[in-house]
């Protein structure tokens, strides 16, 4: 309930993950198959799953380590909602050397039955957005698109451009209503979704966090299938 994991629980999760990896590779060796190269991220992901399961959490938020298609988090079978905030030319040796190729790897987390939110960083260039929207169509998923009311609010995005409008797709729009006037002061924003208007939300700099807040609000709504309790956003 809002507290970091204890050292004992973390150690238990790591031990359980390491043992699971050992058993899997023992079975592969017995079958004459090459053992998996279990990475540190693989171990941490499984350890997190163990900790979350034994703590009995209602919802766990997992972040892909790299891409999405072959990421360790893709082994989770109970994922109900996904979001992609945006993409960049990262890990090109593995994911591909174009934005479109990388988008394809990230879009692989969009699957039938999962709610989906596409952040402002997925909207441009249009060739990248097309990759995500095509995956949504193939999976039978209607995504929620995050949009900025003012282009100045996404000035820090890696691939600036004018986002297209898509009739029939729900949108979560956000606007910065108050900018920081001193070091350490928060910026304030509002987020408007098809379900509700959330005003006077706050986050710290850098400015792109406003887009991330909007994405998080839209994802929580999509996951729950309802508007959020206003008070909960300020806790």
Where are these regions (language model features)?
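Short, conserved phosphate/pyrophosphate- and ester-handling motifs at nucleotide-, phospho-/glycolipid
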Residues: 212
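Extended acidic/charged loop-beta regions that coordinate divalent cations
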Residues: 47-94, 129-199
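A short glycine-threonine-serine/GTX helix/turn-capping micro-motif
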Residues: 98, 201-207
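Gly/charged, well-structured mid-domain segments that form the phosphate/adenylate-handling core
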Residues: 181-182, 195, 205-207, 215-235
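Short loop-to-beta-strand entry elements in the cores of soluble alpha/beta enzymes
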Residues: 110-121
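Membrane-proximal helix-turn-helix segments that form the acceptor-binding/catalytic region
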Residues: 103-111
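Alpha-helical scaffold segments in soluble metabolic enzymes
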Residues: 12, 16, 47, 51, ...
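ATP-dependent carboxylate-amine ligase catalytic core
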Residues: 1-77, 89, 93-101, 123-127
């Amino acid at each position: 309930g809002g507290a970091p994991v204890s050292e004992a629980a973390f150690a238990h999760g790591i031990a359980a993950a390491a043992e699971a990896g050992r058993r899997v590779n023992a079975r592969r060796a017995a079958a004459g198959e090459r053992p998996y190269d279990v990475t540190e991220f693989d171990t941490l992901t499984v350890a997190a799953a163990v900790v979350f399961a034994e703590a009995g959490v209602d919802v766990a938020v997992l972040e892909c380590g790299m891409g999405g298609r072959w990421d360790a988090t893709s082994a989770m079978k109970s994922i109900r909602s996904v979001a992609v905030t945006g993409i960049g030319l990262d890990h090109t040796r593995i994911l591909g050397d174009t934005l479109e190729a990388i988008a394809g790897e990230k879009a692989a987390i969009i699957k039938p039955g999962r709610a989906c939110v596409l952040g402002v960083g997925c909207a441009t260039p249009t060739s990248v957005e097309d990759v995500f929207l095509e995956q949504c169509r193939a999976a039978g998923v209607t995504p929620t698109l995050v949009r900025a009311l003012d282009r100045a609010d996404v000035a820090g995005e890696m691939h600036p451009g004018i986002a297209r409008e898509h009739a029939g797709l729900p949108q979560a729009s956000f606007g910065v209503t108050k900018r920081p006037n001193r070091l350490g002061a928060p910026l304030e924003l509002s987020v408007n979704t098809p379900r509700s208007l959330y005003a006077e939300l706050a986050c710290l700099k850098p400015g792109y966090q406003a887009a991330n807040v909007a994405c998080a609000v839209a994802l929580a709504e999509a996951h729950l299938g309802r508007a959020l309790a206003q008070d909960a956003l300020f806790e």
